[in-house]
């Protein structure tokens, strides 16, 4: 089983600011030495020794969490902007069964759905689940003019199910 947070930000997706990027660059420059630049191997060793806060970013995409059960089946919790990158990873999979759980219909939990590449792959089977009734109607409205050029009925194998959690 594998899991990954593809988005953790609430409300609005936000890219890395210029100030934060400059802070990371300054940190790298303060740590580097001439010997770290001598060869490909020394550069790779230096880069791999840098702390995660310098070499990665967190918090840019809105809510999306993946739990991979197998190579052919994945569970996704919420579909914020992080689902777009996840979809790019999943698009190469054949005959993939995808389960998407939508906790609620706030924009930051659904705004990545129209850009989820497996929607446009006839080999993908996508199941939606929500504790709220009306998910299919709500998503059909989101994937309709003037909000999006491709109607949900033009997407491939989609199933919808309301969950009674009480």
Language-model segments: residues:
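Binuclear metal-dependent hydrolase catalytic cores
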Residues: 1-166
């Amino acid at each position: 089983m594998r899991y990954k947070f593809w988005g953790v930000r609430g409300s609005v997706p936000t890219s890395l600011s210029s100030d934060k990027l400059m802070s990371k660059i300054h940190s790298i420059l303060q740590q580097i030495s001439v010997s770290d630049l001598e060869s490909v191997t020394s550069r790779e060793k230096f880069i791999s020794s840098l702390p995660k806060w310098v070499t990665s970013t967190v918090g840019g995409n809105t809510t999306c969490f993946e739990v991979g059960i197998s190579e052919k089946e994945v569970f996704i919790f919420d579909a914020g902007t992080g689902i777009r990158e996840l979809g790019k990873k999943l698009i190469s999979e054949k005959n993939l069964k995808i389960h998407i759980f939508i906790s609620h219909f706030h924009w930051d939990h659904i705004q990545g759905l129209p850009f989820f590449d497996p929607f446009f792959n006839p080999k993908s089977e996508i199941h939606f689940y929500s504790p709220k009734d009306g998910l299919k109607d709500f998503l059909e409205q989101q994937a309709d003019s003037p909000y999006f050029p491709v109607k949900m009925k033009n997407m491939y194998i989609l199933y919808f199910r309301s969950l009674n959690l009480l």
